[in-house]
Curated annotation (Swiss-Prot):
Belongs to the class-II aminoacyl-tRNA synthetase family. Type 1 subfamily. It comes from Prochlorococcus marinus (strain AS9601). This is Aspartate--tRNA(Asp/Asn) ligase. Pfam families: GAD, tRNA-synt_2, tRNA_anti-codon. The keyword Aminoacyl-tRNA synthetase applies.
């Protein structure tokens, strides 16, 4: 049907007869001549139809509506100099039409304009419902092509290092990995369910036990959790696992992979090793294990200075084992008003939404500190000197303080830090600040349920375990850091991994630490324990979020812009109206009865 696509055309085609297929992007009538912007998947070309070319042809062209599918044949001409479009690769060319065929008319008015000229004015709900029209606009297609290139580069890199791509099951066993599972009823086993995998974690470990040595997979994963801009109920991981490997070797190898992707896709070179930071340093200085290091405003601990000045909120925070921390906003006295950091203000609300009771503040004015009387009246000259030294605050700076539970203080000041950085344009968006975060704790304490929870997952290997007897082993595990590492970019986690537990006894003890009984371990993970007893090699790996990598590379705000047919933030597919009801006969086959609470 066609012998060229738009992007292939250049000055060497002038005078040649070509056949093109595509959509009518726009039609314009000027001085008795019809101009049509023909669009295909590769780009645009202006085509012209003159009454002198034939009355029937001209009449047919007059009926064309935007998005009509056409095939045209004609001669490539050079455009007049005053009509050259320097924004198009074909902007110096046009096609003088000799023949036009309508391949498909549009039936109704479109729900939104497909032309790139109206791209920004369309609500996302409509774009998701009519995703095929959104794809046709080109921007989304370019995103998908960029995603394809990322995958291609990763595959070639891993293939060259002797990795084998293996598909692992999508119908598997429900195991406690953190988020809720998506369950699939098993018709042939009444009352039993498969689960869609949250990750290929256990299968890739079993591949190492099987001697595969180096594995990777572009893996579909599923988590039934609340959504946000960078999450979807189904998502894609670049999943990697290796045998007989150290943590240092995994970090170094995967850093090379990421550098290769950025080089091939964006033509950006990183000559130096990515910096590293321990989990504890990240939490102390940024309040998060995913720090954005493109700007300052580091968290500073003022507990030793303010904990005993007699201000009740500060005293209570320290006595209960909490924090008093601060961030310093350079020049904040002029850029942030009191209204914004008091109850009802936008910055106050950011802290409140993160769980904080509020924000205290200190304004530095010359050698004096301006704050509420209950704080100021209890500050000695020594206190003031210590505050200025720790916070590194100068005249004109604003110090914001949080006090209370450690997690809430860190979380709220982290959110406030991010919010202010965006509001004051402190972020250099041209920077790619990669960071390895290492030495995570094995567990975090769930005080509500009086038990430990794995910070990553319960298959991470603890560091420096020496004990063999159960009681001492239990104590060592509980206080150990993990052989775990995350790669963070500009405040977002790109991927995370660890060395895995390859000894059955240690794996059983870790699972007991997170609250499972021996019986529960055998029921849920018996197959893994058994495999580890049969000569499992030391192994480890990492999983990168492919959707998130693509989002950052293309500069999008949501991973929905990297996925052909994503769900919305209510986990619904607006295109197919899924999830949806199923028939009574289908439910009967599965022996499932649905009851809905009134």
């Amino acid at each position: 049907m066609r012998n060229k696509i738009c992007e292939e055309l250049n000055n060497t085609d002038i005078g040649k007869l070509v056949n093109l297929c595509g959509w009518v992007d726009r039609r314009r009538d000027h001085g008795g001549v019809i101009f049509i912007d023909l669009r295909d998947h590769s780009g645009f070309l202006q085509i012209t139809i003159n009454p002198d070319d034939g009355a029937d042809l001209f009449k047919q062209a007059e009926t064309l509506r935007n998005e009509t599918v056409i095939m045209v044949s004609g001669i490539i001409n050079e455009r007049p100099k005053d009509s050259i479009n320097t924004n198009l690769s074909t902007g110096e060319l046009e096609l003088k039409v000799k023949d036009l065929q309508i391949l498909n008319q549009i039936k109704n008015n479109l729900p939104f304009p497909v032309s790139i000229h109206d791209y920004e004015n369309t609500k996302e709900e409509l774009r998701l419902k009519y995703r095929y029209l959104d794809l046709r606009r080109g921007k989304l297609l370019e995103n998908l092509k960029k995603r394809h290139k990322i995958i291609k580069v990763a595959r070639e890199f891993l293939d060259n290092f002797g990795f084998t791509e293996v598909e692992t099951p999508l119908l598997t066993k429900s195991t406690p990995e953190g988020a809720r599972d998506f369950l699939v009823p098993a018709r042939l086993s009444n009352g039993e369910f498969f689960a869609l995998p949250q990750s290929p974690q256990l299968f890739k470990q079993l591949l190492m036990v099987g001697g595969l040595d180096k594995y990777y997979q572009i893996a579909k994963c599923f988590r039934d959790e609340d959504l946000r801009a960078d999450r979807q109920p189904e998502f894609t991981q670049l999943d990697i696992e290796m045998s007989f490997i150290s943590e240092e070797e995994i970090i170094s190898f995967n850093e090379s992979l990421i550098k290769k992707i950025w080089k091939e896709v964006l033509n950006i070179n990183f000559n130096n090793a990515f910096p590293r930071m321990t989990w504890q340093a990240a939490m102390d200085n940024y309040g998060t294990d995913r720090p954005d290091t493109r700007y300052q405003m580091l968290l500073k601990d003022l507990g030793g200075v303010l904990g005993n000045i007699g201000f009740n909120i500060f005293t209570k925070a320290i006595k209960s084992g909490g924090y008093i921390k601060s961030i310093t906003v350079k020049g904040g006295n002029s850029s942030i008003s009191n209204v914004r950091i008091k109850p009802g203000g936008d910055i106050f609300k950011v802290a409140q939404d993160a769980g904080a009771g509020g924000l205290a503040f200190i304004r530095v004015k010359g050698d004096e500190l301006e704050t509420i009387g209950a704080i100021k009246n209890n500050l000695s000259e020594e206190h003031i000197a210590d505050i200025l030294k720790i916070t590194e605050a100068k005249d004109g700076d604003l110090i914001l303080l949080g006090a209370g539970d450690k997690q809430i203080v860190n979380q709220s000041l982290d959110r406030v830090r991010q919010y202010i950085a965006k509001e004051l344009n402190l972020i250099d968006k041209s920077k790619w600040n990669f960071l390895w975060v290492t030495d995570f704790p094995m567990f975090e304490r769930n005080e509500d349920e009086n038990r430990y929870e794995a910070l990553h997952h319960p298959f991470c290997s603890p560091k420096n375990i020496k004990s063999k007897d159960s009681e001492n082993l239990k104590k060592e595990i509980e206080s150990s850091t993990a052989n775990a590492y995350d790669l963070v970019l500009n405040g977002l986690e790109l991927g995370g991994g660890s060395l895995r537990i390859h000894e059955a006894n240690l794996q059983r003890q870790v699972l007991k630490t997170v609250g499972l009984t021996d019986k529960e371990i055998d029921e849920k993970f018996g197959f893994l324990i058994e495999a580890l007893e049969m000569g499992a090699p030391p192994h480890g790996g990492i999983a990168f979020g492919l959707d998130r990598i693509t989002m950052l590379i293309i500069g999008a705000d949501s991973i929905r812009e990297t996925i052909a047919f994503p769900k919305n933030q209510q986990a619904k597919c607006l295109l197919t109206n899924a999830p949806s009801n199923v028939s009574e006969s289908q439910l009967k086959e599965l022996d499932i009865e649905i009851t809905i609470d009134e």
